[in-house]
Protein backbone atom coordinates (compact mmCIF):
# COMPACT_ATOMS: atom_id res chain seq x y z
CA UNK A 1 0.00 0.00 0.00
CA UNK A 2 1.30 3.47 -0.87
CA UNK A 3 2.01 5.42 2.30
CA UNK A 4 1.35 9.14 2.34
CA UNK A 5 4.24 11.22 3.68
CA UNK A 6 3.32 13.14 6.79
CA UNK A 7 5.26 14.94 9.49
CA UNK A 8 5.07 13.23 12.86
CA UNK A 9 5.32 14.89 16.22
CA UNK A 10 6.51 12.81 19.19
CA UNK A 11 4.05 10.76 21.21
CA UNK A 12 3.02 12.67 24.32
CA UNK A 13 2.45 10.39 27.32
CA UNK A 14 -0.32 11.22 29.74
CA UNK A 15 0.18 9.93 33.27
CA UNK A 16 -2.81 9.25 35.48
CA UNK A 17 -2.32 10.93 38.83
CA UNK A 18 -1.41 8.62 41.67
CA UNK A 19 -1.57 5.44 39.56
CA UNK A 20 1.04 2.85 38.70
CA UNK A 21 1.13 1.74 35.07
CA UNK A 22 2.47 -1.24 33.16
CA UNK A 23 2.54 0.52 29.79
CA UNK A 24 5.70 0.55 27.73
CA UNK A 25 8.17 3.38 27.14
CA UNK A 26 7.84 5.51 30.23
CA UNK A 27 4.89 3.80 31.86
CA UNK A 28 1.97 5.61 30.22
CA UNK A 29 -0.73 3.34 28.84
CA UNK A 30 -2.35 6.10 26.76
CA UNK A 31 -0.28 8.37 24.52
CA UNK A 32 -1.31 11.21 22.22
CA UNK A 33 0.20 12.53 19.02
CA UNK A 34 -0.97 15.38 16.80
CA UNK A 35 0.10 14.92 13.18
CA UNK A 36 1.68 17.83 11.35
CA UNK A 37 2.19 18.96 7.77
CA UNK A 38 -0.58 17.85 5.38
CA UNK A 39 -2.10 15.73 8.17
CA UNK A 40 -2.42 18.60 10.63
CA UNK A 41 -5.79 18.26 12.34
CA UNK A 42 -5.51 14.50 12.84
CA UNK A 43 -4.82 13.51 16.44
CA UNK A 44 -3.99 9.93 17.36
CA UNK A 45 -4.57 8.13 20.64
CA UNK A 46 -2.17 5.22 21.06
CA UNK A 47 -3.30 2.46 23.42
CA UNK A 48 -0.12 0.91 24.77
CA UNK A 49 -0.49 -1.70 27.50
CA UNK A 50 1.41 -4.66 26.03
CA UNK A 51 1.55 -6.77 29.19
CA UNK A 52 -2.26 -7.04 29.23
CA UNK A 53 -3.02 -6.71 25.50
CA UNK A 54 -4.56 -3.27 26.09
CA UNK A 55 -7.08 -4.67 28.56
CA UNK A 56 -9.35 -2.07 30.15
CA UNK A 57 -7.85 -1.75 33.61
CA UNK A 58 -8.15 1.07 36.14
CA UNK A 59 -5.08 2.99 34.98
CA UNK A 60 -5.92 2.56 31.30
CA UNK A 61 -9.46 3.85 31.83
CA UNK A 62 -8.32 6.77 34.01
CA UNK A 63 -5.73 7.90 31.48
CA UNK A 64 -8.13 7.61 28.57
CA UNK A 65 -10.83 9.58 30.40
CA UNK A 66 -8.33 12.34 31.20
CA UNK A 67 -7.03 12.39 27.63
CA UNK A 68 -10.53 12.75 26.18
CA UNK A 69 -11.38 15.53 28.63
CA UNK A 70 -8.35 17.49 27.44
CA UNK A 71 -8.80 16.86 23.73
CA UNK A 72 -12.52 17.65 23.56
CA UNK A 73 -11.70 21.31 24.31
CA UNK A 74 -9.08 21.49 21.53
CA UNK A 75 -10.64 22.94 18.38
CA UNK A 76 -7.52 21.98 16.42
CA UNK A 77 -8.58 18.32 16.62
CA UNK A 78 -10.54 17.70 13.42
CA UNK A 79 -10.34 13.90 13.50
CA UNK A 80 -9.49 11.65 16.46
CA UNK A 81 -8.01 8.27 15.58
CA UNK A 82 -7.74 5.37 18.05
CA UNK A 83 -4.95 2.88 17.36
CA UNK A 84 -2.94 0.26 19.22
CA UNK A 85 0.76 0.18 20.02
CA UNK A 86 0.53 -3.56 20.67
CA UNK A 87 0.92 -5.64 17.52
CA UNK A 88 -1.95 -8.00 16.79
CA UNK A 89 -4.29 -6.41 19.32
CA UNK A 90 -6.67 -3.45 19.30
CA UNK A 91 -8.11 -3.97 22.78
CA UNK A 92 -8.64 -7.32 24.49
CA UNK A 93 -11.56 -6.06 26.57
CA UNK A 94 -11.99 -6.07 30.33
CA UNK A 95 -9.04 -6.81 32.59
CA UNK A 96 -10.55 -9.90 34.20
CA UNK A 97 -7.49 -10.51 36.40
CA UNK A 98 -7.94 -7.06 37.89
CA UNK A 99 -11.69 -7.61 38.06
CA UNK A 100 -11.20 -10.76 40.17
CA UNK A 101 -9.69 -8.65 42.95
CA UNK A 102 -12.74 -6.37 43.16
CA UNK A 103 -15.74 -6.72 45.43
CA UNK A 104 -19.20 -6.86 43.86
CA UNK A 105 -19.72 -3.20 44.74
CA UNK A 106 -16.38 -2.24 43.19
CA UNK A 107 -17.25 -4.14 40.01
CA UNK A 108 -20.47 -2.16 39.68
CA UNK A 109 -18.65 1.15 40.13
CA UNK A 110 -15.92 0.22 37.65
CA UNK A 111 -18.35 -0.92 34.95
CA UNK A 112 -20.20 2.37 35.39
CA UNK A 113 -16.89 4.16 34.73
CA UNK A 114 -16.40 2.04 31.62
CA UNK A 115 -19.87 2.97 30.41
CA UNK A 116 -19.04 6.63 31.02
CA UNK A 117 -15.80 6.25 29.06
CA UNK A 118 -17.62 4.84 26.04
CA UNK A 119 -20.20 7.63 26.27
CA UNK A 120 -17.38 10.20 26.32
CA UNK A 121 -15.91 8.66 23.17
CA UNK A 122 -19.32 8.65 21.46
CA UNK A 123 -19.93 12.27 22.47
CA UNK A 124 -16.53 13.53 21.31
CA UNK A 125 -17.32 16.56 19.13
CA UNK A 126 -15.02 15.69 16.22
CA UNK A 127 -15.25 12.51 14.11
CA UNK A 128 -13.61 9.46 15.70
CA UNK A 129 -12.12 6.44 13.92
CA UNK A 130 -11.09 3.07 15.38
CA UNK A 131 -8.18 1.38 13.58
CA UNK A 132 -8.59 -2.31 14.45
CA UNK A 133 -5.41 -4.15 13.47
CA UNK A 134 -6.03 -7.12 15.76
CA UNK A 135 -8.25 -8.53 18.47
CA UNK A 136 -11.17 -6.34 19.61
CA UNK A 137 -13.13 -8.41 22.09
CA UNK A 138 -15.79 -7.50 24.64
CA UNK A 139 -15.03 -4.01 25.89
CA UNK A 140 -12.53 -3.60 23.06
CA UNK A 141 -15.32 -3.90 20.52
CA UNK A 142 -17.53 -1.67 22.69
CA UNK A 143 -14.79 0.98 22.47
CA UNK A 144 -14.75 0.66 18.68
CA UNK A 145 -18.56 0.79 18.56
CA UNK A 146 -18.43 4.10 20.43
CA UNK A 147 -16.38 5.56 17.56
CA UNK A 148 -18.05 7.06 14.51
CA UNK A 149 -16.14 4.95 12.00
CA UNK A 150 -14.33 1.61 12.18
CA UNK A 151 -11.60 0.19 9.95
CA UNK A 152 -10.37 -3.38 10.47
CA UNK A 153 -7.70 -5.64 9.11
CA UNK A 154 -9.40 -8.54 7.36
CA UNK A 155 -7.61 -10.88 9.79
CA UNK A 156 -8.73 -8.97 12.90
CA UNK A 157 -11.00 -10.83 15.31
CA UNK A 158 -13.86 -9.08 17.09
CA UNK A 159 -16.96 -9.92 19.07
CA UNK A 160 -19.02 -9.26 22.17
CA UNK A 161 -17.98 -12.49 23.88
CA UNK A 162 -19.14 -11.66 27.40
CA UNK A 163 -21.75 -14.44 27.56
CA UNK A 164 -18.95 -16.99 27.16
CA UNK A 165 -17.53 -15.67 30.45
CA UNK A 166 -20.78 -15.61 32.38
CA UNK A 167 -21.22 -11.88 31.75
CA UNK A 168 -23.13 -9.60 29.43
CA UNK A 169 -21.91 -6.51 27.60
CA UNK A 170 -21.95 -3.68 30.12
CA UNK A 171 -20.20 -0.77 28.42
CA UNK A 172 -22.75 0.03 25.73
CA UNK A 173 -22.61 -3.14 23.64
CA UNK A 174 -26.26 -4.07 24.13
CA UNK A 175 -27.26 -0.61 22.91
CA UNK A 176 -24.75 0.31 20.21
CA UNK A 177 -24.54 -3.05 18.43
CA UNK A 178 -28.30 -3.21 17.61
CA UNK A 179 -28.19 0.43 16.50
CA UNK A 180 -25.37 -0.54 14.17
CA UNK A 181 -26.59 -3.90 12.85
CA UNK A 182 -30.25 -4.18 13.81
CA UNK A 183 -31.86 -5.94 16.75
CA UNK A 184 -32.07 -9.52 15.46
CA UNK A 185 -28.46 -9.74 14.32
CA UNK A 186 -27.17 -8.03 17.45
CA UNK A 187 -29.07 -10.53 19.59
CA UNK A 188 -27.61 -13.43 17.63
CA UNK A 189 -24.05 -12.18 18.06
CA UNK A 190 -24.45 -11.41 21.77
CA UNK A 191 -26.39 -14.60 22.62
CA UNK A 192 -23.79 -16.79 20.89
CA UNK A 193 -20.68 -14.80 21.83
CA UNK A 194 -19.59 -15.28 18.22
CA UNK A 195 -16.26 -13.96 16.99
CA UNK A 196 -16.06 -12.34 13.56
CA UNK A 197 -13.14 -11.71 11.26
CA UNK A 198 -12.64 -8.24 9.86
CA UNK A 199 -13.94 -9.47 6.52
CA UNK A 200 -17.10 -10.92 8.08
CA UNK A 201 -17.63 -7.74 10.10
CA UNK A 202 -17.42 -5.68 6.91
CA UNK A 203 -20.01 -7.84 5.16
CA UNK A 204 -22.39 -7.31 8.09
CA UNK A 205 -21.74 -3.56 8.20
CA UNK A 206 -20.03 -3.61 11.59
CA UNK A 207 -16.92 -1.94 10.14
CA UNK A 208 -16.71 0.61 7.34
CA UNK A 209 -13.67 -0.93 5.67
CA UNK A 210 -11.71 -4.19 5.88
CA UNK A 211 -8.21 -4.35 4.42
CA UNK A 212 -5.64 -7.10 3.99
CA UNK A 213 -3.04 -6.99 6.75
CA UNK A 214 0.50 -5.91 5.81
CA UNK A 215 3.90 -7.04 7.07
CA UNK A 216 4.05 -4.19 9.57
CA UNK A 217 0.70 -5.17 11.06
CA UNK A 218 -0.80 -1.70 10.68
CA UNK A 219 -2.93 -1.93 7.53
CA UNK A 220 -6.10 -0.84 9.34
CA UNK A 221 -4.27 2.17 10.77
CA UNK A 222 -3.00 3.16 7.32
CA UNK A 223 -6.51 2.93 5.87
CA UNK A 224 -7.99 4.77 8.85
CA UNK A 225 -5.50 7.58 8.39
CA UNK A 226 -6.36 7.79 4.70
CA UNK A 227 -10.03 8.06 5.71
CA UNK A 228 -9.14 10.83 8.17
CA UNK A 229 -7.33 12.63 5.35
CA UNK A 230 -10.57 12.62 3.36
CA UNK A 231 -12.36 14.33 6.25
CA UNK A 232 -9.65 16.96 6.88
CA UNK A 233 -10.41 19.31 3.95
CA UNK A 234 -14.11 19.57 4.83
CA UNK A 235 -15.57 22.42 6.88
CA UNK A 236 -14.94 21.39 10.51
CA UNK A 237 -17.96 23.15 12.01
CA UNK A 238 -20.27 21.64 9.41
CA UNK A 239 -18.77 18.20 10.05
CA UNK A 240 -19.24 18.52 13.81
CA UNK A 241 -22.81 19.75 13.42
CA UNK A 242 -23.52 16.94 10.98
CA UNK A 243 -22.37 14.49 13.64
CA UNK A 244 -24.71 16.07 16.20
CA UNK A 245 -27.65 15.95 13.79
CA UNK A 246 -27.08 12.27 12.99
CA UNK A 247 -26.39 11.14 16.56
CA UNK A 248 -29.30 12.98 18.13
CA UNK A 249 -31.67 12.55 15.23
CA UNK A 250 -31.40 8.78 15.13
CA UNK A 251 -32.53 8.57 18.77
CA UNK A 252 -35.91 10.23 18.11
CA UNK A 253 -38.79 10.06 15.63
CA UNK A 254 -38.14 11.49 12.18
CA UNK A 255 -40.14 14.69 12.77
CA UNK A 256 -38.04 15.47 15.85
CA UNK A 257 -34.94 14.48 13.92
CA UNK A 258 -35.78 16.96 11.17
CA UNK A 259 -36.14 19.66 13.82
CA UNK A 260 -32.70 18.77 15.19
CA UNK A 261 -31.26 18.95 11.69
CA UNK A 262 -32.85 22.38 11.26
CA UNK A 263 -31.31 23.66 14.49
CA UNK A 264 -27.88 22.39 13.47
CA UNK A 265 -28.23 23.94 10.03
CA UNK A 266 -29.20 27.27 11.59
CA UNK A 267 -26.04 27.22 13.72
CA UNK A 268 -23.94 26.80 10.58
CA UNK A 269 -25.49 29.67 8.61
CA UNK A 270 -23.52 32.52 10.24
CA UNK A 271 -20.13 30.78 9.97
CA UNK A 272 -17.25 32.15 7.91
CA UNK A 273 -16.73 28.67 6.50
CA UNK A 274 -20.18 28.67 4.89
CA UNK A 275 -19.43 31.98 3.19
CA UNK A 276 -16.03 30.66 2.10
CA UNK A 277 -17.66 27.57 0.62
CA UNK A 278 -20.11 29.66 -1.38
CA UNK A 279 -17.33 32.00 -2.56
CA UNK A 280 -15.09 29.10 -3.59
CA UNK A 281 -17.93 27.56 -5.59
CA UNK A 282 -18.61 30.87 -7.33
CA UNK A 283 -14.91 31.45 -8.05
CA UNK A 284 -14.30 27.83 -9.09
CA UNK A 285 -11.51 27.22 -6.57
CA UNK A 286 -10.85 24.92 -3.64
CA UNK A 287 -12.27 26.34 -0.39
CA UNK A 288 -10.00 27.02 2.57
CA UNK A 289 -11.96 26.34 5.72
CA UNK A 290 -10.70 27.70 9.04
CA UNK A 291 -13.28 26.38 11.47
CA UNK A 292 -14.95 29.72 12.18
Curated annotation (Swiss-Prot):
GO cellular component, one term: mitochondrion
Pfam families to which the protein is assigned, alphabetical: ECH_1 (PF00378)
Entry keyword set: Acetylation, Fatty acid metabolism, Lipid metabolism, Lyase, Mitochondrion, Transit peptide
A biological process term (GO) from this entry: fatty acid beta-oxidation
Family according to the record: Belongs to the enoyl-CoA hydratase/isomerase family.
Protein source organism: Homo sapiens (Human)
Keyword Transit peptide: yes
Keyword Translocase: no
Protein name: Enoyl-CoA hydratase domain-containing protein 2, mitochondrial
Encoding gene (name): ECHDC2
Superkingdom of this protein's organism: Eukaryota
Cell location: Mitochondrion
PANTHER family associated with the record: ENOYL-COA HYDRATASE DOMAIN-CONTAINING PROTEIN 2, MITOCHONDRIAL, ENOYL-COA HYDRATASE-RELATED
Residue range covered by the transit peptide: 1-35
Modified residues (N6-succinyllysine): 97
PTM-bearing positions, type N6-acetyllysine: 97
SUPFAM superfamilies named in the record: ClpP/crotonase
Entries under InterPro entries matching the protein: ClpP/crotonase-like_dom_sf, Enoyl-CoA_hyd/isom_CS, Enoyl-CoA_hydra/iso, Enoyl-CoA_hydra_C
Signal sequence interval, chain numbering: none
Chain positions of site Important for catalytic activity: 142, 162
GO MF, any single term: lyase activity
Chief location bin: mitochondrion
